């Protein structure tokens, strides 16, 4: 895959987010076709990971997208395959270390600067995607970062 093709996938992830999809959906859908996964099904599978998993502000949805894509790329399919499982875990840990280095945290609440359990877990209602939302949230940049990290992984394979 060329650099240009990978750049287009990174941009597709950002475009997905700007169209209203969650962080995880945006990242996974940008690469899902590489694994024979229909984009609609990819968005459904990734839907609950938005807002730091169900808007609980836990692991960043964009980061969860990296994890899901690594599973599609190199996840083991036999329960007894410890070597395959370990290889997948190594890739996840390496890519998430890069994400943490770039973004300061893997945790949605920390990335958003939300302090306190009650404030971070106050509602299951998705935020309205207004101009103010996009202006004040770092999420599009985090989606871009996650997609770029995964694209670079694919390039280096």
What are these regions (language model features)?
Residues 1-18:
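Polybasic, low-complexity association/targeting segments
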Residues 2-4, 30-48, 118-123:
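Acidic-glycine-rich active-site phosphate/pyrophosphate-binding loop
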Residues 15-19, 26-37:
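Long, hydrophobic N-terminal alpha-helical segment
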Residues 23, 60, 108:
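Short cysteine clusters
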Residues 29-33, 69-70, 80-157:
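Amphipathic alpha-helical interface segments
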Residues 49-56:
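Transmembrane alpha-helix interface/packing and boundary motifs in multi-pass membrane proteins
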Residues 59-65:
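Membrane-inserting effector segments that mediate pore formation, membrane fusion
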Residues 65-75:
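DPxDG-like acidic metal-binding loop motif
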């Amino acid at each position: 895959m060329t650099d240009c093709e990978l750049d287009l996938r990174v941009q597709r992830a950002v475009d997905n987010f700007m169209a209203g999809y969650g962080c995880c959906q945006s990242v996974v859908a940008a690469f899902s076709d590489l694994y024979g996964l229909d984009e609609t099904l990819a968005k459904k599978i990734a839907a609950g990971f938005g807002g730091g998993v169900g808007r609980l502000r836990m692991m960043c949805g964009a980061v969860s997208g990296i994890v899901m894509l690594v599973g599609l790329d190199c996840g083991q399919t036999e329960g007894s395959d410890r070597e395959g499982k370990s290889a997948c875990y190594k890739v996840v840990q390496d890519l998430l270390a890069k994400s943490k280095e770039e973004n300061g945290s893997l945790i949605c609440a920390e990335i958003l600067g939300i302090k306190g359990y009650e404030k971070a877990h106050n509602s299951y209602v998705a935020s309205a995607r207004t101009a103010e939302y996009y202006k004040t949230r770092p999420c599009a940049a985090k989606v871009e970062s996650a997609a770029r990290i995964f694209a670079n992984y694919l390039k280096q394979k």
